[in-house]
A protein has these predicted regions:
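N-terminal subdomain of nucleotide-sugar transferases
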Residues: 1-55, 60, 86, 152
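Conserved donor-binding/catalytic core segment of Leloir-type glycosyltransferases
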Residues: 3-7, 179-182, 188, 194-213
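Active-site proximal beta-strand in glycosyltransferases
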Residues: 4, 90, 106-128, 155-157
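A short, histidine- and acid-enriched strand-loop-helix "catalytic/donor-clamping" loop
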Residues: 12-13, 99, 118-136, 186-187
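Alpha-helix capping/helix-boundary segments
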Residues: 45, 98, 162-164
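Short N-terminal targeting/anchoring amphipathic segment
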Residues: 81-104, 114-119
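Membrane-proximal helix-turn-helix segments that form the acceptor-binding/catalytic region
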Residues: 138-157
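Carbohydrate-associated surface elements
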Residues: 162, 182-183
Length: 213
């Protein structure tokens, strides 16, 4: 069974990231019987100062059909990314602005990821609306990444032809893109998402991509 590493800001039991979080849940629950999913994310929800209760550090927590490694703020180091990438068949990073994203691109460019294919989820990053927010900072960051060749050895995951055009417009016509439409909403055994949103769910680690691959 192929092993897929997903690097993202937040995962269950978090709920504040909305669409991006829901997408990862749908992928892991829909394809979890065909692939082994390993997710590395922060140990707390967006804007929270406290970590999730009952999680364990420095080990994989079983969450639904995925194994999740929780990281404290500032914990996405180069060494950690290399460590969790070892033995994986594919690395899927949710964007590139965050430290886990650009550090993965740097390691990939330097040949430190053992040749493991890297997929970057565009996640609307290059839409006109997204780029209009802090435009100078974002364009500078994108251009620096391009100058150092950080986008040359990756593939982009997009959800539509329009997003594909946005990527090529900002990265270049040679950007290799894969159109993978969103997977239908799925449920995770033992999790009531309404209770998560209401802050009533007590999380316990024991509850228990085809196009991209």
């Amino acid at each position: 069974m192929r092993k897929i590493l997903i690097l993202t800001g937040r995962y269950l039991p978090g709920h504040k990231d909305g669409g991006p979080l829901r997408t990862i849940i749908n992928i892991t629950e829909a394809l979890g019987n065909d692939y082994e999913f390993y997710i590395v994310c922060l140990d707390r929800d967006h804007g929270d100062t406290k970590s999730y209760p009952y999680i364990e550090y420095e080990r994989w927590n079983i969450v639904g059909k995925a194994k999740v490694w929780y990281v404290k703020p500032g914990g996405f180091s180069y060494d950690l990314i290399k460590k969790v990438s070892s033995g994986k068949d594919l690395i899927y990073t949710c964007g590139f602005y965050e430290s886990y994203g650009y550090k993965t691109l740097i390691l990939n460019q330097l040949g430190k990821l053992q040749g493991i294919p890297v997929i970057v989820a565009a996640m609307g990053t290059f839409s006109e609306g997204a780029l209009s927010h802090k435009p100078l900072k974002k364009k500078l960051f994108i251009n620096v990444c391009k100058v150092f060749g950080l986008f040359k050895k990756v593939k982009w995951s997009v959800t539509s032809e329009l997003e594909l055009e946005d990527v090529k417009k900002n990265i270049g016509e040679n950007a290799e893109c894969i159109i993978a439409e969103d997977i239908p909403r799925t449920s995770v055994p033992g999790i009531d998402f309404n209770k998560i949103a209401e802050g009533k769910l007590h999380f316990c680690p024991e509850f228990a991509l085809q196009k991209i691959c």
